[in-house]
Amino acid sequence: MAGNESPRGTHSARVDPLTGERTTIVSRRQSRPNLPDGDCPFCPGGLEAPEPYEVRWFANRWPPLPGGRAEVVLYTDRHDATFASLGVGGARRVVDLWAERSEVLGARPDVDYVLVFENRGPAVGATIAHPHGQIYAYDHVPARAATEYDRFSEHGEDPLDAHAPGPDLERLV
């Protein structure tokens, strides 16, 4: 496939003329399927998980970024689980897979920034309820990430540490 074409539509990079921030428009992204729980492709026997598993990843079938730079990470084969319910061992398996895939994607010459995040609920655009996250490998450093990096560099340490309660401070909620 040539250029930014994918089986799910054309990817178009745009720049906001007011802020200079880059974004990607995917023409057919809104045509992703909304599946009922009974037909979950992430459950064992489903399209993306033919066998039981503990944790797994695969290329996103509806990629928001072109060139194999979007992956889905399934946290568990249990449809009703959450990341918090995985326990230490399950969470460790997920984090290890995040690290492994981030390293692989980050080593690509066309990748400048790797973002790992969790998808949960329709409010954030998740079309499947099964516990999962995604990994995006950008060909540029997004503006917010660049700003955060600059702030870390200015402080020489985590700038949030100055706002965290110390061991002798009372935490107010």
Regions found by a protein language model. Name each.
Residues 1-130, 136-173:
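Active-site microenvironments that recognize anionic phosphate/pyrophosphate groups
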